[in-house]
Amino acid sequence: IAALLFIPFLGGVHLFDWDEINFAECAREMIVSHNYLNVQIDFKPFWEKPPLFIWMQVLSMKAFGINEFAARFPNAVCGIITLLVIFNIGKKLFDERFGLWWVIVYAGSILPHFYFRSGIIDPWFNLLIFIAIWFFVQLNTNTGVISPGKRFLYAALWGSFTGLAILTKGPTALLIIGLVASIAYLPHFLILVIIKKKKKKNPPLFTLRFR
């Protein structure tokens, strides 16, 4: 069903957004130059974006040819994966019915149909950030219940998806995940500060006796 939502008529409209045109051109130049390590425009270094999304477009163009469909196909795949991810997370948080409703509401919105039928970086970046934050939450929830092995797995997955997000759009990923982590730990930090202040105002009785 997700494939029917995002794949048909994917190449029916010319690339029109500045980012769509540039990223597709970067992928085309990678194929022409056989230089898969450096992103370039006009065969000159293009330092604005990391290469992960461009690599996806290269693979797509090698499979489907250099055209609009191939430039946008990676994001259609991203749309399918996104629906599967939110269904499974919804199912884990509540139940299968909640996961299904989450998918229906999300797929019924306008923005996903614009994003997943485009050739821009943001859909993959958003998905990778979302998954990274999910594993961060898993790592820091019920810390006394989950085993050390599972904690290590969650930490490794959190780090891996954060790294993939950085490879997709750069250090912006660190800022977003760092902000989320800061907000998550802020209550704990404030509680510690309050406890320390109370201890300073009200020293233990045994210290008062010996003054």
Residues covered by each model-derived region:
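Membrane-integral, polyisoprenol-dependent glycosyltransferases
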Residues: 1-197, 202-211
